[in-house]
Amino acid sequence: GDSSSRAKALARAVADGRVLELSVYSPSMKRHVPVRVLVPADRSMPRPTLYLLNGAGGGEGTGHWFEQTDIVDFVADKNVNVVVPMRGAYSYYTDWLKVDPVLGRNKWTTFLTSELPPLIDRKLNTTGVNAIAGISMAGTSSLSLAEAAPQLYRAVASYSGCADTSTNLGRLAIRAVVEGRGGGDIANIWGPVGSPGWRAHDPVVNAYKLRGRAIYISTGTGVPGPHDQLQGQGIDGKTTIYIDQIAVGGAIEAATHQCTLNLDRRLKQLGIPATVDYA
């Protein structure tokens, strides 16, 4: 549906008491993080939890799950809690080595694996069974977080994310997001480019840590598809958006396609089953 129908779906869910707007203090980041939670209509039993991460904008603009997808309607009949942090733009949802002059203090691995889950488990009476998924920038993050805390997540999904961080292609993708869009300095993430921290956080290098998890990965090819037309959803005849979607979006999707091939190959070498969808 379009954004007005999505807004209505969200309003209905709010009215039904299915949406919780939390403000969660992060000791590691020394600030409050807004977290939007979708709970099932039937809360009589403990439920599993899906941690769903927004793309590059971190949910701070309109490019987030609630604005761009039918997530509210999609999970309405699923017996699952959905937890969406609404901050973290251009952070890659990782623990940064240094405070960035533009992007500030980012300790998202700590927040998402240590600080937030115990609070969610207590507040929502969960089963303690978790999954994590992310799109675009956060597709990389979801894989990395699942490797950082394998005992925490039963399943992981990455949509249009580049799994590499220590290859030229992976670094290019991170630079495009953090520096190109966020104005930050990528050396503040894991140290200077090429330093050991970059390999230590590379989901392809560390893919063996995903063993035993349910894994879903999807990517496009970067070739313009049926929605990439001037009248397509979210474009509405605006030429600059169209050019941006084809040139920038296409290039990013082509890069994530190659990254996904790399991850797919690595998982096969390791004998780790995964569902990989080349849309």
Where are each of the predicted segments found?
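Non-catalytic cap/lid and distal C-terminal segments of serine-dependent acyl enzymes
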Residues: G1-A279
